[in-house]
Amino acid sequence: MSPIAFLLPFLLQMVLSTNVSTTSNNGVTEIRLDNKIVDLTKATVLERSKCCTVYRPVEDSSCIIVSSKHGASMVNCHGSVSISTSGKLSAEEMAEFNSLTQKYSG
């Protein structure tokens, strides 16, 4: 087997991977994909519930973002999942966020 064939899966993963960063402070969440701040006002809404919204950002259309009203977020990009919470979530909001996170993290 040639060295290139052996390294190809690793090289593809490096090329296709997205650097994900989420931070929350006092209920305000900032999400970055490859060091660019995600603008959720431009993202496609995939699902909306009472407490949470699921987005597909224009910055990387292969990513999924679940965002709650009070500062919880989950970002799934190329199988890499990042979760951040801040602020106070009610039991209902936390249950809804957890349900959507499970649905969209796989």
Swiss-Prot record:
It is found in: Secreted. Expressed by the venom gland (anterior main gland) (at protein level). Its main location: secreted. GO terms for cellular component: extracellular region. Residues 1-17 form the signal peptide. Contains 2 disulfide bonds. Keywords: Disulfide bond, Secreted, Signal. The keyword Signal applies. This is Venom family 8-like peptide Pr8a. It comes from Platymeris rhadamanthus (Red spot assassin bug). The lineage of its organism: Eukaryota, Metazoa, Ecdysozoa, Arthropoda, Hexapoda.
